[in-house]
A protein has these predicted regions:
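N-terminal Rossmann-like or analogous alpha/beta NTP/dinucleotide-binding catalytic cores
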Residues: 1-110
Length: 110
């Protein structure tokens, strides 16, 4: 079985789903105020590999992630560009998904 670092316990602990064979993952997604960078790619790939490993191991995985679409950085960019913040987030959310699709990261279930 896979072991993951538990930050609260400060140690590696075996992954033990509440319901055997079913794993739920929530991963914070990006704040979409600019194009994705290497750090975004890294966290996306790390959790994509974990998800795929868990699926390969026979688990039913539910993967949930968010897109932060309102934030000071978004509002600052909108002000600098002279356009509504909703246009900024809509544009960069599309850029985000295109980039993740390009590197083969599976999209979240929700």
């Amino acid at each position: 079985m896979i072991r993951l670092h538990d930050t609260a316990a400060g140690e590696l602990l075996p992954l033990s789903p509440r319901e055997p064979g079913k794993v739920s993952m929530y991963v914070c997604g990006p704040t979409v105020y600019g194009p994705p960078h290497l750090g975004h790619g890294r966290f996306s790939l790390v959790f994509d590999v974990l998800r795929r490993y868990l699926e390969w191991s026979g688990n039913d995985v539910t993967y949930v992630s968010n897109i932060t679409d309102i934030d000071d950085k978004i509002l600052d960019r909108a002000t600098r560009e002279g356009r509504p913040w909703t246009e900024v987030t809509e544009h960069y959310e599309q850029v985000w998904w295109q980039a993740m699709d390009a590197i083969g990261v599976k999209r979240p279930d929700h």
